[in-house]
Amino acid sequence: MFSNWFSGDECGQYRKSPHKQRMDHVGSSLLELRYANEVIRQHLHEWLRFSRHLEERGLTLPATDGDMVRQYLARRTAKTSASRSRVLRASVRIFLDTDERGQFRRRVGSPPVTPTWFAPILKPYLLFVQTHRGLAAKTARKYTQKLSAFAQYLEGAGVTELDRITPGHVREFYENAKNNAPRRSYGSTLRVFFRWAAGQGWLSSSLRDAVPRPRQYRYVNLPDVLGQTEVDRVLAAVDRSTPLGRRDYAVLVLAARYGLRPCDIRQLTLDEIDWREARIDLRQVKNGRPLVLPLLPEVAGALSAYLLDGRPVSTNRTVFLRHNAPFEPFAVENNLATIMRDALRRVGLADRPGRRGLYLFRHTLATRLLAVGQPLKAIADVLGHASTQTTYGYTRVEVDGLRSVAISAEEVIR
C-alpha cells in the first residue's frame, strides 16, 4: 500500500516485513486523520527500522520488552535534536499501541504513576467520590495525581500498607510541597481520603487531624487586570488573515467580552450557539450551572468568520479544534494559555508581572463592569458565579468606587 513511499532496498524490506499489515493499517489511519504526508513518511520509515530491530532479535508483537524499547529509543535519540527525539518516540509509541484496525491512543501528557500496592485502594475511592460526591472527571484526575504522589512518597519511606502511615509521614510529605497553594490543595485531598479510608476500617480516624491546617486569609491578593486600551490592543494585534488567527481571535473575543472561563470556551459546542435567537446557551464546566449570554455582534462576527473560513472540516461538534492533525478538540488539560500568551507577546506584554492566561480577561471584565456601576448580582450572572461572594473580590480593584465611599480620617477621629 505504501510501497511508493520507500525507495531502493527499503521498498523490498517493507514488502517482506512481517509487520507490513500493521504499518499499512496505522498509516491509513494517519491519512484519514489528515496528518501531513511528510509526517506519515517519517513514521513509516521509523516503523520499518523498528520492525527490523524486532526481527533481528526474534521478537514479535505485542510481546515486547519495555527495557528493550527504552534501549532502542536511547540509541536512536542519542544524537538527535529534542524535536526529532519527540518524533521518534511518538513513532514507536504509535506502532506499539495500534490495534488490528490501525487505531491508537493519542497520549496527552504523562499519566500519573500509581504504585502497584496503592492502585486497588485508589480505584474504589475514586468511584466513591465520583458517585456520591459528584466529582467531575477533571477533579478526579487531580485527586489521582495527588494521591499517587503521596503513595510514591510512602513507598520511598518503606510504607506499602495504609495502617502503617503515621502522622509524621503526613507532616513530612505536606511540608515538602513547594508553596502554600499546593499545600492547601494536597491538605484537602488527603483529609477527604483519610476520612473515607477510616470509614472502610483501613486506618485510624485520627490520621486526618495530622494534616496541617494553615491559616488562610481571603482576598490576600488583588485580582490582576488589564486596562481597556490594552485589551483593545491585544485583540487588534491578532492576524485574522489566517485560519489559525481567526480561531485565536474568536477565543480571545469570547474571553474578553463575556469573561468566559477557558474550560467553557474550550468545550463550547456548535449546538450551544443559537444564531436565530442571537444567544449562547451553555452549561458551565466548573459548576454545571446553565449560562445564557446574548450573542454580541462582535462575537457573532468572530465566530462566523472562523466557522465559515478557518475551522478544519470535521464532524466533531466542538467549536474550537486543533489546527494540526488529527484536527480534534483541545485536551481537557489545555487551558488555551498559549493563545493568550502569544497575543500578549504581539503587543509587548509577554513579560508583564502577574497573570498571562485567559483568566486575565475574565478579571478585567469583572472590574470594568464594576467601574461602570453594574451591581454585583448582574456581574455574577455574566461571569456565571454561583454566589456574589465570589464576585465581591473584584471590589478591591475598583479603586475609584472605593474612594467615593471611603470615610475620611477626620470622620474617624470624631
Regions found by a protein language model. Give the residues of each.
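Conserved catalytic core of the tyrosine transesterase superfamily
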Residues: 1-414
